[in-house]
A protein has these predicted regions:
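Charge-dense, helix-prone N-terminal extensions
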Residues: 1-119
Length: 119
């Protein structure tokens, strides 16, 4: 997966916006659904992406896939860093992005989910 495929997959989801919100990290591209982050990457090198995960799955994924590691700057109980080293199939990376999006949507308020469904 290259950066454009990653971006295209993320931005195609309902209610998603993209931004560079971290002033001191100007190359970090963040994708959010209704203002809640579900994935991010450093576009200067695209070495890895971060995705939100169910806490029950975090350790299992790290033990199963060498490319899945704890992230440097995010909560290690809820997020994983996936190295974009071509050892994990693109289809699985897309699934993890989808799971991250779904997890964030699930945790939106009823009003926010209603707003998302209307968009």
């Amino acid at each position: 997966m290259n950066i454009e495929e990653y971006r295209g997959h993320c931005i195609s989801k309902k209610g998603v916006t993209e931004s560079f919100p971290f002033g001191k990290l100007p190359d970090v591209l963040v994708f959010k659904v209704l203002g809640k982050m579900f994935t991010a990457t450093d576009i200067s090198n695209f070495e890895a992406i971060s995705v939100k995960c169910n806490p029950e799955d975090v350790e299992h994924l790290r033990e199963t896939y060498m490319a899945v590691q704890p992230p440097a700057y995010m909560n290690k109980k809820h997020w994983n860093k996936i190295m974009m080293d071509h050892t994990v199939p693109d289809s699985l990376i897309k699934k993890w992005i989808d799971d991250s999006y779904d997890l964030v949507v699930k945790n939106l308020s009823i009003l926010e989910r209603h707003k998302l469904n209307e968009s």
